[in-house]
Amino acid sequence: MSHPHLSRRQLLSLMGASAVTVVATACGSQDDSTDTSGGSSSITAKSDPLRRFRHGVASGEPLPNAVVIWTRVTPSDDALPGTGKGAATEVFWEIARDAEFKNLVQSGKVMSSALRDHTLHIDVTELQPSTSYWYRFATTDGLSPTGRTKTAPALNAKPAALRFGMVTCAEYEFGFFAGYRHLADRN
């Protein structure tokens, strides 16, 4: 009896696709996105990330044509994580090909909710493979830090090298976790 054989590449591709499917299903959003290819940013909020975006930004689940971008908005000082407090807040997001946001690719707006602890997961699609993008979030009175992400290589690509970095929930309250900086510095 012969057993089917999967190459390491096929196994990793299958595992990645399965994980993305689970996360995308679990983290759906009510995103009102717009293709703004080639346009410039219209966000005019003040850059005060500690006011509304105390938890920063993150990205993950890279596919050749998509990434997930994340943030947590703090709509009021008492809306700390896990409290269930804070009014629903309109949050704008942008993703661009440059750090100055002069070449926007997409933008949109979503509503945060205490039911989701004011965390936002945006599945940004229709991106180019192996491409770096910059992203950010804004409210009417706050602008998040800018994040940088990169899409995965095309499915038929054969890159000379491919590196993965994996992190899990770090419970920031127990340390500063310099490991994240080391991961970013290795890029």
Regions found by a protein language model. Give the residues of each.
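C-terminal motif of bacterial Sec signal peptides marking the signal peptidase cleavage site
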Residues: 25-26
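N-terminal secretory signal peptides and thylakoid transit peptides that target proteins
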Residues: 1-22
